[in-house]
Amino acid sequence: MSLDRKINRIQFLSGNSLKVIAVLTMLIDHLCKIVLQWLLSNYWGAMADNGQMSWERFREIDYFIRFDLQSIGTIAFPLFCFLLAEGFQHTRSKKRYIGLMLAFALISEVPFDIGFFSAYSRMEDTFPFYLKYQNVFFTLFLGLLTLVCLERFSCKSDLPVDRIKSAVLQVLSVVLFSGIAEGIHCDYGMQGILFISAFYICRNHRIYQVLLFLLAYMGATGNQPPLCTLLAGLLILLYNGKRGKLKLKYFFYVFYPAHILALYLIQVGLGNRSHNGFLPQCWKKVLH
């Protein structure tokens, strides 16, 4: 029995299952970055300074948030890239798919900017806009354009010269859109283009998809894949090729800007309550 057939026997995760896992792990990551790191910077450090909390305890919390919790969030992006490549193959209208991605990239930009970069945009007097970094939908949009080129330049001839020409054009497409993603500072940048391309190029062999994805990770970062990135690869191996019963087609599109805005409002609410002395008293009880 071939390796692909052995893997097929243990696949049980639908596309909806992967999407839910990706959304939950992304939520954990963004909760850390928007709310918990803000508390770390604005309150827990001050509490350690004035003796309300030990520095050892502060460092434990800092490590837990920045490394343990946020590492869970690294599972999300490879799953979204994989689902994008899958969606590209099965969509009825590629133009509509690309247009939808661009529309939500524009819709999500203000929530993304105020959620992650409000302090910087206020310093630069550009609030609520922060033009130096773009949300992940722009990365996915560029990824779709890359897939259009990969499909357009795929070789349908057995002639060596045609195969070489096709390969060169495909590589140049990946390089071009990777450069654009880096140039406009999209979230994940070149990594996103490489991941999406890897999942599409090896679309007929799941094990090769995951292996090329891991190679793309090492090529983009220069590092060995961490545990949670390997876990993302394992989850992709367990994908059964089915969409699932629930209709979650547009859920992520809406959830992405909505949850960032909600987390930012929580951050603002915590800041307002701090003026009444609520936070120092509350966290003193929690952290001791």
Regions found by a protein language model. Name each.
Residues 1-288:
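Alpha-helical transmembrane segments and their immediate juxtamembrane cytosolic regions
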